[in-house]
């Protein structure tokens, strides 16, 4: 049993590492430095139109794995509000990195949608991994 638990944890660790690498590739390293600049602090400013709506869906989907896997890795993030806050902080870190490296626009809409995605993933994880009574 211990071997199987360690094996499962190792597998989850590898998945988390791959997920974080993919997030950084998609949100930062895939873009040329200095190619995108700007700050959007107005909530819902980027919504509307098919392309913008696709970005909304993309941002939500991008963070569902965060909410799903991260609480399984770190016990301190197993409560829903804590996990959602961690998703917010991770999203904020990405947006600040994009701003500082000029590899993306800093948008509060992205932070909101990413946080929603982390929350959805956390709820799915809580339901999926709930212990039976």
Describe the role of every protein-language-model region.
Residues 112-120:
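Small-residue-rich transmembrane alpha-helices that serve as helix-helix interface/gating elements
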Residues 1-108, 122-133:
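Bulky hydrophobic segments
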């Amino acid at each position: 049993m211990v071997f199987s638990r360690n094996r499962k944890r190792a597998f989850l660790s590898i998945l988390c590492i791959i997920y974080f690498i993919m997030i950084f590739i998609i949100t930062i390293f895939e873009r040329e430095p200095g190619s995108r600049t700007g700050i959007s602090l107005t909530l819902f400013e980027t919504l509307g139109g098919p392309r913008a709506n696709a970005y909304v869906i993309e941002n939500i989907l991008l963070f569902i794995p965060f909410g799903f896997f991260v609480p399984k890795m770190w016990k301190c993030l197993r409560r829903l509000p804590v996990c959602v806050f961690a998703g917010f902080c991770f999203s904020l870190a990405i947006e600040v990195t994009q701003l500082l490296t000029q590899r993306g626009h800093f948008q509060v809409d992205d932070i909101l949608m990413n946080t929603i995605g982390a929350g959805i993933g956390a709820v799915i994880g809580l339901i999926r991994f709930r212990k039976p009574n």
